[in-house]
Amino acid sequence: MKKFSFSIVLCSLFFSGCAQDHGPKIQDELGPKYIYETVVDGIDIPWGMTFISDTELLVTEKSGILYHVMDGVKTELSGLPEIYVRGQGGLLDVTTAPDFETSRVIFFTASSSDGEAAGGHTALYNAELDGASLANLKQLYKGEGNTKKGQHWGSRISFDAEGHLYFSIGDRGNREVNPQDITRDGGKIYRLNQDGSIPTDNPFYNQKGSKQAIYSYGHRNPQGMLTHPETGAIWVHEHGPRGGDEINVIGAGKNYGWPTITYGINYSGTPITSDRDLPGLEQ
């Protein structure tokens, strides 16, 4: 099963840098040639997508619509939960279960207002694809600590070779508290079994007061995630501050430093920290 994200326009951009005395040089062309083709249009903010066959796609629209796409035609699917659309939040990633061809199960993340506090947080769901609708919808995880802030929800989903599910939640705009506190949701990569239960070998499973689903922490807004096809490692793209984007290979229990260390600055141009590297924090 093929998996692509971020765009409905399928394209490949090839580039290469050659180290020279005066710095890297970008080559204008590399063979073979690639072309791009518009598969479907009329989707305002496509957030995630996944192939369900060689000719069919599921595509999320951030405003809260899940589309089935085939032969250039998009069909809106029914059965989604209520989506809390605010700022960067809405309907986020979608992917298929490893056994999708037999189970017809999909997983997706979305902003949810469930809970007592006002506002929302990122939630993970699964459901069975049944024609043009979703059946047996289940909420597998919901971040606690709702907030009306509209930024940094994450979110992407991937699986390891053993079938564990990984998904991301951003710091929800509370960088001074959430990312470095393993008793709080936000700024984390999570690891679950596909039924929503928590693996007992998770790094903080036996730590009192911790969120047992946490796999790594110290993240700002992980908006890209893939499993390396050869090594099986989980690679995450971190949407950082200005000048502070990162690509990280995720390790169990590791602290990726946000906001204690960063190469970035605030979008306003003011500094966040002068620290770039500290003991116990991943680069």
Kindly give the residue locations of the regions a language model identified.
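Acidic, Gly/Ser/Thr-rich repeat motifs that build Ca2+-stabilized beta-propeller blades
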Residues: 21-175, 224-227, 232-240
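Beta-propeller domain segments
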Residues: 23-26, 89-91, 101, 172-283
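Sec-dependent signal peptide recognition
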Residues: 2-9
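C-terminal motif of bacterial Sec signal peptides marking the signal peptidase cleavage site
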Residues: 15-17
